[in-house]
């Protein structure tokens, strides 16, 4: 015979514990919220029915004695709704239909975590690492395509080719080729950058390549000559434009101006007084009214 006892739990919920009549303390099954129902509701199982109060056992048959009611009947948990006891449905994980919203929320949370991780991976590294990576990419990109046929083999040189340098190449002092002359130098005498074309010629718009000190000074002389030639061209252009402007645009004079001759001084005058005509100097307009007094 199966008996159902209602016990008050320690938590906020009261659950029904089911015990077998033959062994009331050893055959304890997992409590299920599907068996919670109102005191006046009738519960049915897979083989029989239980009517009246929960403690009534008058209609039980020998076929279902010692067996547990079925937990898959959907009518057993229809008395309690989600609005009345939401905590029951929140804590219940056996029914996939009830736990679907919470599973989707967990899935959304996991997707957000994955997106945050992807964002953290996509963030650029520190300034030092980024500068190193940029310099390496720039070095590799600018080294592609330049001619290396004129480079001297490493086995031919064991000392720096700079005249006053005696550094011997080894484990700590490495060989460095000048991209223009192709000779081998130490790191100190091959640390300059000059713009070159693909056929290792000077070009102001070319890419920067490693060069030795001698080639760097040759580049400075070449650039100085280019600047001097450009400045001379500008001077020649200005000198040719100025006379053309002078001939095409002579100095302007007043429209209504009349030139009046200035009489010369008479050498016979002892006192050096000027004649009366000399009082009129410069130019006089046409509409000038002369006084008759």
Curated annotation (Swiss-Prot):
Low complexity: compositionally biased ranges: 44-62
Biased composition range(s): Polar residues: 63-75, 242-256
GO annotation, biological process: positive regulation of TORC1 signaling; signal transduction
Binding site for Zn(2+): 178, 181, 212, 215
Matching SMART domains: FYVE
SS bond list: none
Keyword annotations from UniProtKB, A to Z: Membrane, Metal-binding, Phosphoprotein, Transducer, Vacuole, Zinc, Zinc-finger
ZnF region ranges: FYVE-type: 156-220
Phosphoserine: residues carrying this PTM: 259
Top-level taxon of the source organism: Eukaryota
One GO CC annotation: vacuolar membrane
UniProt cross-references to InterPro entries, sorted A to Z: Znf_FYVE (IPR000306), Znf_FYVE-rel (IPR017455), Znf_FYVE_PHD (IPR011011), Znf_RING/FYVE/PHD (IPR013083)
A GO MF label: zinc ion binding
Topology of this chain in the membrane: Peripheral membrane protein
Region entry Disordered, spans: 38-75, 242-276
Pfam families for the chain: FYVE
Its job: Functions as an intracellular glutamine sensor that directly activates the TORC1 signaling pathway, to promote cell growth when glutamine is available.
Protein name: Glutamine sensor pib2
């Amino acid at each position: 015979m199966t008996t159902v006892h209602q016990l008050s739990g320690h938590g906020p919920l009261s659950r029904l514990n089911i015990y077998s009549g033959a062994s009331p303390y050893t055959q304890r099954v997992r409590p299920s919220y599907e068996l919670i129902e109102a005191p006046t509701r009738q519960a049915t199982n897979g083989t029989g029915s239980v009517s009246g109060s929960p403690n009534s056992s008058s209609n039980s048959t020998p076929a279902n004695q010692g067996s547990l009611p079925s937990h898959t009947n959907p009518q057993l948990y229809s008395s309690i709704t989600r609005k009345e006891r939401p905590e029951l449905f929140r804590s219940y994980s056996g029914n996939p239909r009830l736990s679907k919203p919470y599973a989707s929320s967990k899935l959304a949370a996991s997707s957000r975590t994955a997106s945050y991780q992807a964002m953290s991976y996509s963030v650029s590294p520190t300034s030092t690492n980024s500068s190193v990576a940029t310099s390496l990419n720039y070095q590799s990109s600018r080294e592609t395509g330049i001619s290396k046929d004129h480079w001297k083999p490493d086995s031919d040189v064991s000392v720096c080719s700079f005249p006053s340098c005696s550094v011997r190449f080894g484990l700590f002092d490495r060989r460095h080729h000048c991209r223009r002359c192709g000779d081998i130098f130490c790191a100190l005498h091959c640390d300059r950058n000059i713009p070159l074309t693909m056929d290792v010629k000077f070009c102001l718009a070319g890419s920067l390549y490693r060069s030795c000190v001698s080639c760097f000074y040759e580049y400075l002389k070449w650039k100085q000559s280019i600047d001097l030639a450009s400045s001379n061209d500008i001077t020649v252009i200005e000198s040719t434009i100025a006379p053309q402007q002078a001939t095409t645009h002579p100095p302007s004079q007043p429209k209504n101006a009349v030139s009046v001759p200035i009489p010369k001084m008479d050498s016979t005058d002892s006192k050096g007084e000027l004649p009366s005509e000399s009082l009129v100097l410069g130019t006089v307009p046409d509409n000038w009214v002369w006084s008759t007094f």
